[in-house]
């Protein structure tokens, strides 16, 4: 039986910080012939069709995970809900300025 794989195993796009690719792959193998006796009869059986769903995942980082490090993708900052990844410390913003609560609900910008 002869089979070949027409499916590509290369990455499915550019190498971003995190990427996941899941594309189906179908492999068709050659037909088989069988001789059944007696009396001699030739029957052609269809070849198997093999299906798979390969997955490739790439995860990376461009900055340290320390608090205060700026992580960005294409000059757009990304973090944990706030600018510079300080969303859990009462700071908010879109990376263009820092605003946060100071003391009894006073807003510091």
UniProtKB/Swiss-Prot annotation:
Pfam families: Keratin. Keywords: Acetylation, Keratin. Disulfide bonds: none annotated. GO terms for molecular function: structural constituent of cytoskeleton. It comes from the Eukaryota. One of its GO terms (cellular component) is intermediate filament. The modification N-acetylserine is found at residue 2. Belongs to the avian keratin family. PANTHER family: BETA-KERATIN-RELATED PROTEIN-RELATED. This is Beta-keratin-related protein. The lineage of its organism: Eukaryota, Metazoa, Chordata, Craniata, Vertebrata. The gene is BKJ.
